[in-house]
Design a protein with these regions (language model features):
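Helix-to-loop junction immediately C-terminal to a conserved catalytic motif
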Residues: 50
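Pre-Walker A (P-loop) beta-loop-beta motif of ABC nucleotide-binding domains
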Residues: 22-33
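ABC ATPase nucleotide-binding domain
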Residues: 5, 25, 61, 346-348
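ABC ATPase nucleotide-binding domains
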Residues: 70-229, 233
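The feature captures the beta-strand-to-loop junction immediately N-terminal to the Walker
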Residues: 35-37
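Glycine/charge-rich catalytic "coupling/switch" loops of P-loop NTPases
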Residues: 252-308, 338-366
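ATP-binding/catalytic-site motifs of ATP-hydrolyzing domains
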Residues: 59-61, 65, 211
Length: 366
């Protein structure tokens, strides 16, 4: 097993910078997820680690070894792609064993490793089948099994769940989390899906335009985003953002949004004071906007009037799309709510969980 380090890694394709001065240290046995929109450079970073792309600048280390000039086959890593890439004419057993056979591993050792991986993945009963006889989820497990039998130092996953339906993605996420615990190996996982990142990662690295925006635990990333991009990318529905001004009145601070204002929580950061009478971006998550009749006790609620545009019943909650003057926002409320399309109502903003961002830099004010 091994740690992985990106040390000021840059990757260029001509004049295009795909990865820009990336520095991340991934601990041994960690489950790190690289997340970001399509084209942000996350898969390129993974391919550089795998040796499928040459690094333009910087170093990549696996353990204490710099691997920039090490051939992919000698890096002791295993990669699982979005495409399962199974040999259609081979059985599941032979697909899983193929890499070991190329390395001239003894037959009894091959059987032991394949049987061990099949047991972990619960595909023992599929070893004699051909890929065409398998479901999408089963094929994905075979592809993972082919990686497991190699006993690599590091597992790389490049959007492995993209071809699965929604129900199967949920099941496979849980399976991969269990697999990580069982194997105790370093996992590095690339996805554009923030739900996958939040549910599986021990840490998440958010990337935009080839630049690392923030790296932290899922909960801390969610609660304390460093900038507007991270705040909007992590969470579903995403955070509501409003153009606003910070005002001071009788010793208290208010977020002034034109047609309404809300009082800032008493325990606000001292840094807010420097932004009085300046334009800011006010952010609040949908789950921090409540129907007052069903708001949790003890929250620091500020009432805001709005017109209900659309409601979406999700079963255990309702997404309410609201128009308030020139502002629109989404509230994530109790399913017992009486809000209906076209109705007016009051919404409680839990200001204890508000966020403020610098309008020019888009960085969080703390």
């Amino acid at each position: 097993m091994a740690s992985v380090t990106f040390d000021h890694v840059t990757k260029k394709f001509g004049d295009v910078i795909a990865v820009n001065d990336l520095s991340i240290h991934i601990e041994d046995k960690e489950f790190l997820v690289l997340v970001g929109p399509s084209g942000c450079g996350k898969s390129t970073a993974l391919r550089c680690l795998a040796g499928l792309e040459e690094v333009t600048e910087g170093r990549i280390l696996i353990g204490d070894q710099v691997v920039n000039d090490v051939a992919p086959k000698d890096r002791d890593i295993a990669m699982v792609f979005q495409s399962y890439a199974l040999y259609p004419h081979m059985s599941v057993f032979d697909n899983m064993a193929f890499g070991l056979k190329l390395r001239k591993t003894p037959k009894d050792e091959i059987k032991r490793r394949v049987d061990e991986a099949a047991k972990i993945l619960n595909i023992e009963h599929l070893l004699d089948r051909k890929p065409r006889q398998l479901s999408g989820g089963q094929r994905q497990r075979v592809a993972v099994g082919r990686a497991i039998v190699r006993h690599p130092k590091v597992f790389l996953f490049d959007e492995p769940l993209s071809n699965l339906d929604a129900k199967l993605r949920v099941e496979t996420r849980a399976s991969l989390s269990r697999l990580h615990q069982q194997l105790g190996t370093t996992f590095i996982y690339v996805t554009h899906d923030q739900v996958e990142a939040m549910t599986m990662a021990s840490r998440i690295a958010v990337i935009k335009d080839g630049i690392l925006q923030q790296i932290d635990t899922p909960q801390h990333l969610y609660d304390y985003p460093d900038n507007i991009f991270v705040a909007g990318f992590i969470g579903s529905p995403s955070m509501n953002f409003f153009n606003a001004h910070l005002r001071a009145d009788d010793g208290k601070l208010y977020v002034d949004l034109g047609n309404f204002r809300v009082q800032v929580s008493e325990g606000h950061p001292e840094a807010y004071r420097a932004y009085v009478n300046k334009p800011v971006i006010f952010g609040i998550r949908p789950e921090d906007i409540h129907d007052p009749d069903f708001a949790p006790p003890g929250i620091e609620a500020q009432p805001v009037e709005g017109m209900v545009d659309v409601t979406e019943l999700m079963g255990n909650e309702v997404f309410v799309y609201v128009q308030s003057g020139e502002h629109t926002f989404i509230a994530r409320v109790d399913p017992r709510t009486r809000f209906k399309m076209g109705s007016k109502g009051l919404f409680s903003f839990n200001m204890k969980n508000m966020h403020l961002f610098d309008k020019d830099t888009e960085k969080a004010i703390r």
